[in-house]
């Protein structure tokens, strides 16, 4: 596997993790009274 593909996969994984964290934070904020 070439380096650009590895970098792209890592970037995609990081973006997915950030989106999950944002969604979790939003859910936590919405759950607060």
From Swiss-Prot:
Repeat listed as a keyword: yes
Blocked amino end (Met) modifications at: 1
Annotated keywords: Antifreeze protein, Repeat
Function: Antifreeze proteins lower the blood freezing point.
Similarity section: Belongs to the type-I AFP family.
Record protein name field: Ice-structuring protein GS-5
Source organism per UniProt: Myoxocephalus aenaeus
């Amino acid at each position: 596997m070439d380096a650009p593909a590895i970098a792209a996969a890592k970037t995609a994984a990081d973006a997915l993790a950030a989106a999950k964290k944002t969604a979790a934070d939003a859910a936590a904020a919405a759950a607060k009274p």
